C-alpha cells in the first residue's frame, strides 16, 4: 500500500504517525512537527504528523476541545507548507469530511465510531487513505467487517480499495482501564489491511481522573516494543513538549524530549523482527 508517498507493509520499515493530541497553538504545532521530522529523517522512519482540530469526545463538556475546524486546518496546512510533511487528522461528522480531506493527506476515524456504517462509507469515499481505529469494545476479528465496509464503499465510488489501515488502541478491561492483547495485531492482519498500533491511547485510563482521562505513559515503550515484536506496519504515538501542561491526553503522551531515544530503540527492534519470517500461519 502506498501511503502519503511511501510504501507500507510488514516487509517495510514501520512508519510513524505522531504529534500532539490536539492543536493548541500554531507555534507549538510547527515546532513539534519540525522536531519529529528531524528525528524521523535521522532514523529513516517514514513520518506523518498528527493532531486534532477538535476533540469531540472529551470526558467533560468543559474540557478544551481545540481551536475549531477552520483554525485547526489552517495550522495543519501550515505544517504541510513549511515542513513538507504529510498530515493526518480525525473527523467526527460526515459533513466535516470534504473540507478536511481538502487539506490533509490521511483521515482518521475515532474508535467510538467504527461501527457507524454511513460514517465509515463517507470517509472511504473521500479519496484519502483512512486510518480506521478499532473500538475499545470490538473484537479484533470484527475489524474485517469494518474494513470490508470501507472497501465496498470505495469500490462503489470507483476508488482504490487499497487505502485503509486497521488501528489497535486497546480494549476495555473493566472500568477506567484498557489492556492490549497482542494477538489482536495478528488477527487484524488477516483483513489484508496494514495494521497500526496506537501505543499512547492504549495506556490511557479512560475517564480515570473524573472529568478527564488518566494514563500510564511509562508503559508506552513496553507496548510499542511488544507491537513491533508481534509485527505491525506502523506505530501511532502522541507526544507533547511538556505533557504536564497538555490540554488533552497529557498523562499518556510521550515527552517530546524522549522521542528520539524511544524511536532509536524501536527502529533497532523493527529491523531485527522483519529480518525473520512470521510463522503464525505455519502453526494452523
Swiss-Prot record:
GO MF annotations, alphabetized: 3-deoxy-8-phosphooctulonate synthase activity
Catalysis performed (reactions): D-arabinose 5-phosphate + phosphoenolpyruvate + H2O = 3-deoxy-alpha-D-manno-2-octulosonate-8-phosphate + phosphate
Gene3D superfamilies named in the record: Aldolase class I
Compartmental location: Cytoplasm
Main location: cytoplasm
Known EC number: 2.5.1.55
Pathway assigned to this chain's UniProt record: Carbohydrate biosynthesis; 3-deoxy-D-manno-octulosonate biosynthesis; 3-deoxy-D-manno-octulosonate from D-ribulose 5-phosphate: step 2/3; Bacterial outer membrane biogenesis; lipopolysaccharide biosynthesis
Example GO BP: keto-3-deoxy-D-manno-octulosonic acid biosynthetic process
GO CC annotation, single: cytoplasm
Taxonomic superkingdom: Bacteria
NCBIfam families on file: KDO8P_synth (TIGR01362), PRK05198.1 (NF003543)
Protein name (Swiss-Prot/TrEMBL): 2-dehydro-3-deoxyphosphooctonate aldolase
Gene name of the record: kdsA
Amino acid at each position: 500500500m502506498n501511503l502519503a508517498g511511501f510504501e507500507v507493509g510488514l516487509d517495510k520499515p514501520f512508519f510513524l504517525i505522531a504529534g500532539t493530541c490536539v492543536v493548541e497553538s500554531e507555534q507549538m504545532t510547527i515546532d513539534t512537527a519540525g522536531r519529529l521530522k528531524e528525528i524521523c529523517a535521522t532514523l529513516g522512519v517514514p513520518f506523518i504528523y498528527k493532531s486534532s482540530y477538535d476533540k469531540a469526545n472529551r470526558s467533560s463538556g468543559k474540557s478544551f476541545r481545540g481551536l475549531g475546524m477552520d483554525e485547526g486546518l489552517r495550522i495543519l496546512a501550515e505544517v504541510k507548507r513549511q515542513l513538507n510533511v504529510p498530515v493526518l487528522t480525525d473527523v467526527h461528522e460526515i459533513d466535516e469530511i470534504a473540507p478536511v480531506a481538502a487539506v490533509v493527506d490521511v483521515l482518521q476515524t475515532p474508535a467510538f465510531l467504527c461501527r457507524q456504517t454511513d460514517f465509515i462509507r463517507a470517509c472511504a469515499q473521500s479519496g484519502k487513505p483512512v486510518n480506521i481505529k478499532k473500538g475499545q469494545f470490538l473484537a479484533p476479528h470484527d475489524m474485517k467487517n469494518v474494513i470490508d465496509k470501507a472497501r465496498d464503499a470505495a469500490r462503489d465510488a470507483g476508488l482504490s480499495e487499497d487505502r485503509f489501515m486497521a488501528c489497535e488502541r486497546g480494549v476495555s478491561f473493566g472500568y477506567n482501564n484498557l489492556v492490549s492483547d497482542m494477538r489482536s495485531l495478528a488477527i487484524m492482519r488477516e483483513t489484508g489491511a496494514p495494521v497500526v498500533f496506537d501505543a499512547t491511547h492504549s495506556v490511557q485510563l479512560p475517564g480515570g481522573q473524573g472529568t478527564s482521562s488518566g494514563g500510564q505513559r511509562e508503559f508506552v515503550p513496553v507496548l510499542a516494543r511488544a507491537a513491533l515484536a508481534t509485527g505491525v506496519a506502523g506505530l501511532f504515538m502522541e507526544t507533547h513538549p511538556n505533557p504536564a501542561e497538555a490540554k488533552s491526553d497529557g498523562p499518556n503522551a510521550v515527552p517530546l524530549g524522549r522521542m528520539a531515544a524511544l524511536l532509536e530503540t524501536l527502529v533497532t527492534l523493527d529491523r531485527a523482527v522483519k529480518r525473520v519470517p512470521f510463522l503464525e500461519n505455519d502453526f494452523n
